[in-house]
């Protein structure tokens, strides 16, 4: 699940591009000949923001027409996230699903670029937070930058849990107790709207 199509290191791997999916879901919502929508999802997840965009489009479509998610071999992380906007979610007994979590990777190439390759950097900025994109390349990440990014990840994780709890018709506290990766036969059944 990505925001925009990019070349994959895995070759011709298919990508779920949020802008394309959102456009298609909006078209289905307006199509008078479509009475219900079945989304077949088979993905290990991806970008949290892209998953939120698709979740929103699924939720909006579900207000107009019933949306059913049919999970394939895997519907984990972002794929599970976007499924929670549907009226019904069905998984095969062997579907790997769940994996409710968000992470952010902070690469640090500063030693490679500055010490090994000899790059030199000067930093000119308008305020102390305007150089985030320079962190990890020109210099290591500061603790303050890591703390800000951790807060961003925590907010995304809280939103993810809320989307799942709302979609599963349960409170977040109960959901927290059951957070783990499961197969389709282990996952609690969804209740309909």
Where are these regions (language model features)?
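Amphipathic alpha-helical substructures
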Residues: 167-193
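Small-residue-centered hinge/linker elements
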Residues: 1-65, 74-80, 84-167
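Glycine-rich beta-to-alpha transition loops that act as phosphate-gripper elements at the mouths
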Residues: 70-76, 129, 178-182
């Amino acid at each position: 699940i990505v925001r925009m199509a990019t070349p994959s290191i895995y070759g011709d791997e298919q990508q779920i591009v949020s802008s394309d999916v959102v456009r298609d879901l909006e078209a289905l919502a307006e199509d008078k000949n479509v009475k219900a929508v079945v989304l077949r999802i088979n993905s290990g997840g991806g970008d949290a923001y892209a998953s939120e965009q698709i979740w929103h489009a699924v939720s909006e479509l579900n207000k107009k027409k019933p949306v059913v998610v049919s999970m394939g071999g895997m519907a984990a992380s972002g794929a599970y996230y976007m499924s929670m906007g549907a009226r019904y979610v069905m998984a095969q007994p062997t579907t790997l699903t769940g994996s409710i979590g968000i992470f952010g990777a902070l690469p640090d190439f500063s030693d490679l670029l500055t010490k090994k390759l000899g790059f030199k950097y000067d930093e000119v900025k308008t305020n102390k937070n305007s150089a985030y994109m320079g962190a990890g390349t020109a210099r290591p990440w500061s603790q303050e930058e890591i703390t800000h990014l951790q807060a961003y990840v925590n907010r995304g994780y809280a939103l993810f849990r809320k989307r799942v709890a709302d979609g599963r018709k349960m409170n977040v506290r109960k959901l927290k107790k059951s957070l783990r990766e499961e197969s389709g036969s282990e996952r609690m059944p969804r209740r309909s709207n």
